[in-house]
Regions:
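Phosphate-interacting basic helix/loop segments used at nucleotide- and nucleic-acid interfaces
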Residues: 58, 195-196
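Outer-membrane beta-barrel initiation region
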Residues: 48-53, 59-66, 154
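Alpha-helical support elements that line or immediately flank enzyme active sites
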Residues: 197-203, 217
Length: 312
């Protein structure tokens, strides 16, 4: 067999018997061991991988006026199940806004938001470590049955089973992992905490002269994890990265709007603005593989783990 081939060139489905990729596991798949199957179109083609995505949203909000202050509080949650198995996004948003008359001349308004966003397996694209589109549409063979790929992607002892094996005696992947191995074993996830908002004050000296001061802030902390399981085409690894970012804007303005007659008003202002921003990330990753399978920790690195960082 030409095990180096990881693509199809359109051979006719003529029913010729051949040994499929799952016909070499005597221990765990004795019912298929060395049993040929006809060369034919798969019963479960690439559409078997996909499912209907589901988006569940719910929210509650409360508004109240107390004296000269108007308050609004809202809490929302959004959960999205992706069209590819084992992919998910969840977002929770807490929001508070207000406006208040503090005196005859002084007013204040603002709003604050706190958002927690979690994602599971967000990076399944044309890459070496997440070859979903690559395996299904670029480098693959058209006779593959997706149900078989799903049912047999992992042996009971944890061994990776892929259609793209190196040889009859060597079941390790030559070029590509089983797509279901990627989805359930080579996983990634991230979680972000974000806080942003603004607060402002307006002071009226006269009917034509007033001052405005505002502060805008946006802060987030993002933690990401990426895993390559033992037995994958790529070297087993674990990478964890922490990102932090803060952005603040300050502005102050003095407005003057005199009336220069019955039908004519002049509008002008002077002001100052300042921006402060900070960004940094810290990353740690294993090297040379993982000592123990299914244990993702930097201390499980075969060689000394490495770290890097950046700050601006």
């Amino acid at each position: 067999a030409a095990y180096e081939s990881d693509e199809s060139w359109g051979p006719e489905y003529d029913g010729t018997p051949y040994l499929p990729w799952y016909a070499f596991d005597e221990k765990y798949l004795p019912q298929h061991y060395l049993k040929p199957v006809p060369w034919q179109a798969p019963k479960n083609d690439v559409d078997k991988l996909y499912r209907t995505g589901v988006n569940l949203s719910n929210s509650v909000s409360v508004s109240r006026a107390v004296g000269g202050t108007n308050l609004r509080f809202s809490l929302g949650n959004n959960e999205v199940t992706g069209i590819i198995p084992n992919t998910k996004l969840e977002k929770t948003n807490l929001s508070i806004s207000f406006n208040s008359t503090l005196s005859k001349k002084l007013k204040s308004e603002g709003g604050f938001n706190y958002i927690i966003t979690s994602r599971e397996n967000p990076e399944n694209s044309y890459t070496m470590k997440n070859p979903i589109s690559k395996v299904l549409y670029a480098w693959t063979q058209r006779q593959l049955d997706l149900q078989k790929l799903q049912d047999y992607y992992k042996a009971p002892d944890g061994t990776h089973r892929t259609w793209n094996r190196k040889s009859a005696d060597d079941g390790t992947p030559r070029y590509a992992d089983n797509p279901y191995w990627t989805l359930y074993e080579n996983t990634s996830n991230d979680k972000r905490h974000r806080f942003f908002g603004n607060i402002g004050f307006t002071y009226n000296f006269t009917d034509n002269l007033y001052w405005v001061g505002k502060i805008y802030g946006d802060i987030y902390a993002l933690n990401t994890e990426a895993r390559v399981a033992v037995g994958s085409k790529e070297t087993a690894s674990y990478v964890v990265t922490n990102y932090t970012n803060s952005d603040f804007n300050y502005e102050t303005r003095l407005h003057y709007t005199p009336k220069l007659g019955k039908d004519f008003t002049l509008t002008g202002f002077i002001g100052l603005a300042r921006r402060e921003g900070r960004y940094q990330w810290v990353q740690g990753k294993t090297n040379g593989g993982l000592v123990l399978p299914d244990f993702y920790n930097l201390e499980n690195s075969v060689e000394t783990p490495s770290s890097s960082n950046y700050r601006s």
